[in-house]
From Swiss-Prot:
Contains an N-terminal seven-transmembrane domain with little structural similarities compared to known membrane proteins and which is required for the NHMTs specific activity in the context of N-terminal histidine methylation of secreted LPMOs. This is N-terminal histidine N-methyltransferase. It catalyses: L-histidyl-[protein] + S-adenosyl-L-methionine = N(tele)-methyl-L-histidyl-[protein] + S-adenosyl-L-homocysteine + H(+). It is an enzyme of class 2 (transferase). It is a multi-pass membrane protein. It comes from Emericella nidulans (strain FGSC A4 / ATCC 38163 / CBS 112.46 / NRRL 194 / M139) (Aspergillus nidulans). The lineage of its organism: Eukaryota, Fungi, Dikarya, Ascomycota, Pezizomycotina. Residues 33-49, 97-104, 170-172, 216-558 are lumenal. It holds the Pfam family Spermine_synth. The chain crosses the membrane at residues 16-32, 50-65, 78-96, 105-131, 146-169, 173-194, 198-215. GO terms for biological process: methylation. Protein-histidine N-methyltransferase that specifically mediates 3-methylhistidine (tele-methylhistidine) methylation at 'His-1', which protects the side-chain from oxidative damage. Methylates lytic polysaccharide monooxygenases (LPMOs) destined for secretion, including AN4702. Keywords: Endoplasmic reticulum, Membrane, Methyltransferase, Transferase, Transmembrane, Transmembrane helix. Disruption phenotype: Abolished N-terminal histidine methylation on the lytic polysaccharide monooxygenases (LPMOs).
């Protein structure tokens, strides 16, 4: 193979192509590495310091490029493909210490150990190649240094946009386009850009990745993963990378429940254990009471006092999860439309959680659907709307803005009812802001939490907000009848909301004088970025809670 010196001394086009390739591949790997952290640490916590760290590594690489070139004898570029092959191996073993490392220390430590050196070397070597290829010394040192710097930044940024756009459509479609598969694929591209005999050193890492890395969704690696988590009483039923995260279905073989996982969170679960003399309900019981509480949207009495018949009623459900709530609505004979952004979530709900097929699925971003629907010449309106969106440990704040909730208001019939599930720390400003936004649009609301408030510690909970358009009549629930329970003892206990929360307690949170004051009364689209720090805190709390729900090895093995 040609040594680096000969590559460096070839024509300008060759230098620029290899330099640009290194920058683009570094951008690819940076984004993919972030995706691979999400199943272990959650998507939001993994983002907290990622951008800063990659930026520092890139800047350090650029300004140390001459030192790297001199100290390595122009051989540093050989190490880049080898390092790229070893990154999944390092990450695999470090992820097994995630509980000890904690969050957000775990993502930081993993990236410092693996990703940042790759970014630093890629930028350093690419910088030398781009400078040599452009050969702007005749225009002075200022031009010779800054034009390649700006050009490198543009190329890297273009790589980021390219990989995000590509994966938004194709992630998970093949093994090589899974998260772990992409790490191997990018390493192969690195090797193609910089071929050398040093690649022989990467053979052990490559062999480990394709034979023993349980993160790679192959038949034998899945079997190995099941052997590992079997000691904790779990079995992997299905898994696939998708647009919203790493989606998997897991069975708890001891307690008898099945869950759907999205990254480091659960979209829901249901009991599957069959007991003697037990008649299963029409819709399987969920493991979380909040999904049954959402079904109470049917129990809200109309302002005119006439009971609403299920037959002839229709419902719009924003966010599917495993399909507990929409499944119940369908079982009651309600014409149900489900809007779900992730096609794999919808597929798994049908295949593994008995979601009835007699519904209207809309696989689309809810914001686009609501905007298009409300702007239609004759917008379709619904008797019931259920807003239940939660992935990765943090609420998608874009679906709690004044604009989005106003869109749902336009799609709700005048005597209709909306139920909104909000999961988060009830003490945070972001929670109060979301509640105030909802109340500013719907004049009559009642709030209920899933369980009683804890005496000490963080107050992370699921909360359901029931609202109507009526300004006069308060929200009341009719007494349930046996048919409402769908043959379920669980529903007979949890269908009717019990733990009411005084909505007034959120009226002034964040609006007071002082360091925590001067907040906004409602959330609008252009200001969603103001809530990121609150999302970070809520996601970190959620991570700790999730570690008590499933064993560490289940989260780490993915």
């Amino acid at each position: 193979m040609a040594p680096f010196r000969s590559i460096y001394e070839k024509d300008a086009t060759k230098k620029l192509v290899v330099g640009a390739a290194l920058l683009v591949l570094a951008a690819f790997y940076s984004y993919v590495f972030l995706l691979t952290l999400a199943p272990v640490y959650g998507s939001t916590p993994s983002h907290i310091f990622h951008g800063y760290g990659v930026g520092i590594a890139g800047v350090a690489g650029w300004f140390s490029k001459d030192i790297v070139d001199r100290v390595s004898g122009r051989k540093a570029i050989y190490a880049i493909p080898v390092l790229a092959f070893f990154l999944p191996v390092v990450q695999y073993f470090v992820s097994q210490q995630s509980s000890a490392l904690g969050n957000p220390a775990g993502p930081i430590f993993t990236e410092v150990l693996a990703l940042y050196p790759l970014v630093l070397l890629s930028v350093a070597c690419a910088g030398k190649l781009v400078q040599a290829g452009l050969n702007l010394q005749r225009h002075g040192d200022l031009v010779a240094e800054h034009i390649p710097l700006l050009g490198s930044y543009v190329i890297y940024s273009a790589g980021e946009h390219l990989i995000k756009a590509f994966l938004s459509r194709f992630i998970g479609s093949t093994v090589l386009l899974s998260r772990a598969g992409l790490q191997i694929l990018i390493a192969i591209f690195y090797a193609a850009a910089v071929p050398s005999k040093a690649l022989l050193l990467a053979i052990p890492a490559f062999l480990f990745s394709v034979t023993s890395n349980t993160h790679l969704p192959l038949g034998h690696t899945t079997t190995a993963l099941n052997n590992i988590i079997a000691d904790d009483g779990f079995a992997l039923v299905a898994r696939q990378d998708s647009t919203t995260g790493y989606i998997s279905v897991l069975d708890n073989l001891e307690d008898g429940f099945r869950v759907m996982r999205c990254d480091h969170s659960l979209l829901g679960g249901q009991w599957i254990k069959k007991r003697p003399n037990y008649t299963p309900p029409a819709v399987k019981d969920p493991i979380y009471a909040v999904f049954t509480m959402l079904e109470a949207v049917r129990l809200v009495e109309t302002a005119h006092g006439i009971p609403r018949a299920d037959a002839g009623s229709n419902a719009l459900v924003i966010g599917l999860g495993i399909g507990t709530t929409p499944g119940a609505l369908i079982s009651h004979g309600i014409d149900t439309t489900i809007v779900e952004i992730d096609p794999v979530v919808h597929k798994y709900a049908l295949q593994y959680f008995d979601l009835p097929e007699n519904h209207t699925p809309i696989i689309e971003d809810a914001r686009a659907f609501v905007q298009r629907s409300r702007n239609a010449p004759q917008p379709k309106q619904y008797d019931y709307i259920v807003h239940d969106v939660f992935t990765g440990g943090a609420e998608p704040v874009e679906l709690f803005t004044y604009e989005f909730i106003s869109g749902l208001h336009a799609l709700l019939k005048d005597d209709g009812v909306i139920a909104i599930n909000y999961a988060g720390d009830i003490s945070l400003y972001s929670t109060a802001l979301s509640i105030r936004t909802i109340k500013s649009i719907f004049p009559t609301c009642r709030l209920f939490r899933e369980a009683a408030a804890p005496e000490i510690g963080p107050d992370f909970t699921n909360m359901v907000i029931f609202c109507t358009k009526s300004r006069g009549a308060p929200i009341t629930f009719r007494d349930p009848v046996p048919e409402d329970f769908l043959g379920s003892r669980f529903r007979s206990r949890y269908l009717v909301p019990k733990h009411e929360v005084d909505a007034a307690q959120f009226d002034n949170v964040g609006l007071e004088d002082g360091p925590q004051g001067h907040g906004r009364r409602v959330l609008v689209d252009k200001e969603v970025g103001r809530l990121h720090k609150y999302q970070d805190r809520s996601a970190l709390e959620h991570w700790g809670i999730m570690r008590t729900v499933l064993p560490d090895r289940v989260w780490e093995g993915w």
